[in-house]
């Protein structure tokens, strides 16, 4: 229940995490830093093995997710959840094809993410498509969901335990600019061998890959005459019509939001002139807009194609004590 800040594979060893005493944490942490290299900032919170994903993502005060985000004071932009359940655990897959608790967790994580975004602490999540038995009938389709802050990882980098490649996908996302898709081929091979969370290779599940892709799962794909696997895409649990249907779309907006906030917050409690109705002069609004636009353009070169801020002059800042 303690949060640790890890910056390298050396820190994994310092914490005493090994493939023997904590195979899931060791696997995901190693995969993350294999992608990013040493120096990346990763916050780790390890829970008891019996802890459900839905409990990790709970909207209740003091939940692991809320604890993690609060501890990092808004520095976390990507969150990955994974779980190696105890031997006696039996996943309920009757209605969803994957562990129903994963779907419940995604809904909770979405609510928590929305609440923190209002505090200018936005983040996106990846959850494991755990418990999948290899069948597609009744399979939950993230693309028909309403969790545009949460993606479902069905790619697996552990054939024995069938755990999702969450750390690996987080590392790929963290390594590159926010506008890059996980599926960008120029980013290189993400795995030389891999499976899906039913323990079978993509080749063994070839007849289902298109369906899984269309359903909105993050899986492995390969290309003729190219070795290894690449992510198929970075879908979130939302339809393609959603503005944040993919991870990179949401990450771009999150970064712009934070830059706009950190620029605008410098103006708090500064002295400004207002008209008789308490409204801000248009020239001051234009000044604020210019500062924000310039900050975003400077910090997000190549990551965003267009950005325009707007400060409404028709707002009584004297009575509301707010400026938007």
Task: Tell me what each language-model feature is.
Residues 170-284:
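Long, contiguous, structured domain-core segments that constitute the functional module of a protein
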Residues 36-40, 215-219, 263, 267, ...:
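Short secondary-structure junctions and interdomain/linker hinges
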Residues 1-133:
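Small-residue-rich
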Residues 314-324:
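C-terminal edge-of-domain segments
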Residues 282-305:
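Short, hydrophobic/π-rich interface segment
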Residues 76-208:
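Conserved, well-structured core segments that form the ligand-binding/active-site neighborhood
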Residues 305-312:
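A short glycine-rich, hydrophobically flanked beta-strand micro-motif that places a catalytic Asp/Glu
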